[in-house]
Amino acid sequence: MISKIVLKSFFKTRWMRHDLNNESQETDRFSEKQTLDVFKGTDHPDLEKGVAAIGNVLKTLPLRPGVYRMYDSKGNILYVGKARALRNRVANYTQISGLSRRIQRMVSQTRSMTIVTTVTESEALLLEAQLIKRYRPPYNILLRDDKSFPYILLKEDGTFPQFPSLQRHRGVKRAKGKYYGPFASADSVTLTLNSLQKLFLLRSCSDSFFRNRKRPCLLYQIKRCSAPCVGRISEDDYRDLAVDTRDFLAGKSTHVQKKLVTAMEQASNDLNYELAAVYRDRLKALAFIQSHQSINSGNLRNADIFGIECRAGLACIQVFFIRNRQNWGHHAYYLNHIDEQPLEDVMQSFLGQFYEDKIAPKDILTNYLPSDKNVLEDALSSQRDYRVKFYQPQRGELKKLVDQAVRNAKEAIDRRLAEASTQKQLLKEMVNLFHLDKIPDRIEVYDNSHIMGSNMVGGMIVAGPEGFRRNSYRKFNIKSPSINPGDDFEMMREVLTRRFSRLERSDPDHSSSEWPDLLLIDGGKGQVHAVKDILAEQGISDIAIVGISKGPDRNAGREHFHLVDGSEYALPPNSGLLFYLQRLRDEAHRFAIGTHRAKRAKNLTSSPLDEVPGIGPSRKKALLLHFGTARDVKNASLSELEKVNGISSAIARQIYDFFHHSPA
């Protein structure tokens, strides 16, 4: 998010937008005061009209830092940019001879602009990064994968702070405790957590689970927990384990190792060989973690290392995370819209988006420095209590680290290009098999999931020539009360009706890339014709529909494919296209089942207290801490409810009435 400094300065920010057609003013959450200024041209791409529209705005632009947005005739954002001097930067778009073909196309589509001035260029950079992630304009360099990274949380804010828990965490950091990360992937967190459980035996359960245990759980049996819930370890000994965990995650692994060796030798000298074996196993777990995190980071304690490589129109940036001199994994990013742009500019745009919602370490190493290095350093440093610096090492161990990141980026591109070549050939085969008009750019696959009609959900996954587009996945909670439990046809009707009625309203011309070229349905002829009828009700007839059904005995590898015209196909068991279509179906099935399980788990953990008006998370927690269970809350007297911390007499009366007053 934007730094506090930037937020304060936005109150000094001036929006400029003149509306030639007296359009209504749009509000924006970044400013208090707005003056609207729109510059419009024709509805069709026209370079002269685009230059004229941009030229009009130059008359009012100051020589101040700020951010500009370019819109097409439909009001869609084409591009978000920032400038040290707005007038000079925007003027460049009127010099056609100096623009690349791609930027000329953008100018020809531009019909209006929005300008926001900021106090400093650093603030403009942070605002630009936030707007790019918010609107994902087609002419900006975009991160294809901008999900948050996972952390390990040593949680100490629960019911039993004397027994901290070790958990994985992703998202907003609300819980009290120490966060360690980021880790590059969920797999790296899982691997580290498993090893930490073997090494330090800290609990990983929730406070409610911990409170209600009467005997040790399975983790104790497999030696991954010390069972503090039932007193198998004292508070002091458990606190020592928590301290060792903090030391290890803070990079003091040698200190922890020496401590374990000393304890093992002492147990052996005391002829307590069983205890010595426990310390031996913990040392093995420590060695395993160290072997998987070993990296020669030189003098770097906390750093991010970036390497960018471009080839065949594809760009990849590899990032390595060094925390407390430990390698916490690496992650590959693939970038869109980098045509004809210097790699310094690509790195500038990428890093601005990357750190928009992440904490930047002190040291950042790259093989190409960002084009506005000083501005980016100022922007990132304004959010921290230390100075963030970018480096481009030329020799030594740090250069080897950057080279390693670049090498990984090259290998990732090689793999992606090989996969793309294979996938393109498979899509060509699909065109011939299913009689499609063109190679499908967007394939949508649908599936439903439920158990005996409960927790009914639908799932939609999206794939294209580049693979799965996970940012476009959608989940649907089945809402219609008239659907009979387990009626797959009616569930599919609701899902498709909601999906395409919304799309039809937003884009009746079918010009958006959100429209699919092919629908792949898990089912046979009946499902295919049902989907055809559902789309026809929406006035949609230009989308190909294919059903995939299990063959005889429902054996995988003997699937049949059903078209709208009634034709049916089967592919050889060793067909690459068959394997690809199975992957699409299985991914939709996995996504739908995962959505269903999450909904079911949420319902299983719901409480009658959730239905009491005026009872939020804090009061619910206070009630459960005081009484133990929702049943005890329900059976409590009014005077007992009034004794709970944070529960007033009025709220106590409200709770009591909810559970004890019968309907008239």
Curated annotation (Swiss-Prot):
Residues 254-289 form the UVR domain. It is found in: Cytoplasm. Pfam families: GIY-YIG (PF01541), HHH_5 (PF14520), UVR (PF02151), UvrC_RNaseH (PF22920), UvrC_RNaseH_dom (PF08459). GO terms for molecular function: DNA binding; excinuclease ABC activity. The keyword S-adenosyl-L-methionine does not apply. Belongs to the UvrC family. This is UvrABC system protein C. The lineage of its organism: Bacteria, Pseudomonadati, Pseudomonadota, Alphaproteobacteria, Sphingomonadales. The gene is uvrC.
